[in-house]
From Swiss-Prot:
Keywords: Aminoacyl-tRNA synthetase, ATP-binding, Cytoplasm, Ligase, Metal-binding, Nucleotide-binding, Protein biosynthesis, Zinc. It comes from Borreliella afzelii (strain PKo) (Borrelia afzelii). The lineage of its organism: Bacteria, Pseudomonadati, Spirochaetota, Spirochaetia, Spirochaetales. Monomer. One of its GO terms (biological process) is cysteinyl-tRNA aminoacylation. The gene is cysS. This is Cysteine--tRNA ligase. ATP binds at residue 281. GO terms for molecular function: ATP binding; cysteine-tRNA ligase activity; zinc ion binding. The keyword Cell wall biogenesis/degradation does not apply. Pfam families: tRNA-synt_1e. Zn(2+) binds at residues 27, 221, 246, 250. Binds 1 zinc ion per subunit.
Length: 480
């Protein structure tokens, strides 16, 4: 099945027809603080895309950057370097700050089952290619030097801002650029290389043809893409806040460098909303994964919440919404645990042998429906609804329900199999009427000292994979 994605560049759906080597790049975190769950909604969306691609048979090469230098507090060309600012406030080096928060980021990713990239690109380790890109653009007369900084001249790139709807002919159009740099020729121009930092204590600087300085955030992503993926990129991921500045600047840099169109598909995830605003570190209204854990939520409760909404829709966050997701996830696990506990060893063997060896047409129909939903712009929320339909179905066997749940979980990544087994370790097996009858027969046999019959019943349960445990409260059934 071919994957279709909503393409921000074309404002339409694009098909991904190349199955052999899909190059995907995601804008990763700026490591000056803990990533918040608003950030992680975007990374979960990226994770769902990567897993869906691989599920559908695409071979994927997935890279993510780590911004440890050059991302200013204003996100444009104003403000202080975020990592430097945090380092100074905490009395640590930039390297200590960036390494600590990079490790914290990937630790939270593991808790949320967010896939680790095939390649992690740390900005400060790729300075030579960034300088080389600026030199080439300078040779093409696309840059200018002003007040100690190298600027990109957006008037040289006629399609600048098309993805964001910026019209360069309209001289009053500044999109999100509020603070106008008086040293720019055009309102939409942006810095490629800083040598005249607005702050004298800039810790990380490198020598360049324009003097000691450091790269801009936009240059970093563009140059690292060129170094790792060369002249082609299939999919670029990010949040909707990247559209109007960062990604249009990346496009301008790379396409002027290559003299051709670059990256056909840009995909953007919407905000996580809290109190009618996007979650934001700068505003101080943000929650981390650790905060959720301290309130007795599993990170997978938040992942479940993200699965309930399409990535292009804003998702409202509240503790009530998260609690509802927690209850729903636990209910799903409990139901699936009941199905699993009811299986005999033969049925378990069938389930564990080959998940996609469908024995019934209904299984294949549900599987095909799931594929159809996720392959059309990652409609994972519809896939989740389909899973609930399967769980509640009266026409499917327990094996069929579990088989489909485990298959869907290859993308959803709720750890369903692991959670079921953990659940059964901590709880007694739910017994059906036939089991209850045999347990009662065994109790009577023991009372009548008919130990042969009692042992026969015990052995019958053992062959099914169960252990009978006699307690003061009665006989409990556990997995063997």
């Amino acid at each position: 099945m071919i994957l279709k994605l909503h393409n921000t560049r074309t404002k339409d759906f694009s098909e991904l027809t190349n199955f052999d080597n899909v190059k995907v790049y995601a804008c990763g975190p700026t490591v000056y603080n803990y990533a918040h769950i608003g950030n992680f909604r975007t990374y979960i969306f990226g994770d769902l895309l990567i897993k869906t691609l691989r599920f559908l048979g695409y071979k994927v090469n997935y890279a993510m950057n780590i911004t440890d230098i050059g991302h200013l507090t204003g996100d444009l060309d104003d403000g202080e370097d975020k990592v430097v600012k945090t380092a100074r406030e905490k009395g640590l080096t930039v390297q200590e700050i960036s390494e600590f928060f990079t490790e914290a980021f990937f630790k939270d990713c593991r808790k949320l089952n967010v896939v680790y990239p095939d390649k992690v690109l740390i900005a400060s380790k790729h300075i030579p290619i960034m300088i080389e890109v600026v030199k080439i653009l300078e040779e093409k007369k696309i840059t200018y030097f002003s007040n100690g900084n190298v600027y990109f001249d957006t008037s040289c790139f006629k399609s600048y801002g098309e993805m964001a709807g910026i019209d360069l002919i309209d001289k009053d159009m500044t999109f999100s650029r509020v603070d106008i740099d008086k040293f720019k020729r055009n309102k939409t121009d942006f810095v490629l290389w800083f040598t005249n930092s607005k702050f004298k204590d800039q810790e990380m600087k490198w020598d360049s043809p324009w003097g000691f300085g450091y790269p801009s955030w936009h240059l970093e992503c563009a140059a690292m893409n060129l170094e790792y993926f060369k002249d082609t990129l299939d999919i670029h991921l990010g949040g909707v806040d990247h559209i109007g500045v960062h990604h249009i600047n990346e496009i301008a840099i790379v396409e002027c460098f290559l003299n051709k169109k670059w990256c056909d598909i840009f995909v953007h995830g919407e905000f996580l909303i809290m109190d009618y605003n996007k979650m934001s570190k700068s505003r101080g209204n943000f929650i981390t994964v650790k905060d959720l854990e301290e309130q007795n939520f599993s990170p997978l409760d938040f992942r479940y919440l993200c699965l309930t909404s399409h990535y292009r829709n804003q998702l409202k966050f509240s503790l009530n919404n998260l609690q509802a997701s927690k209850i729903a996830r636990e209910n799903m696990i409990n139901r699936l645990s009941y199905f699993y506990a009811s299986l005999d060893p033969v049925a378990l063997g069938v389930l564990n042998k080959d998940l996609k060896n469908f024995g019934f047409s209904e299984e294949k129909e549900y599987y095909d429906s799931f594929i159809e939903k996720v392959s059309f712009d990652l409609n994972i929320s519809q896939g989740l609804a389909l899973l609930w339909e399967i769980i509640k179905s009266e026409n499917l066997s327990f094996v069929s329900k579990l088989r489909l749940a485990f298959i869907f979980d290859e993308i959803m990544s709720l750890n369903l199999r692991e959670e079921i087994l953990k659940n059964l370790e901590n709880h007694d097996v739910v017994v059906d009427e036939n089991m209850k009858t045999l347990i009662e027969e065994r109790r009577i046999a023991k009372c009548e000292k008919n130990f042969k019959r009692a042992d026969e019943i015990r052995d019958f349960f053992a062959k099914k994979g169960f252990v009978l445990v006699d307690t003061k409260e009665g006989t409990k059934v556990k997995r063997g």
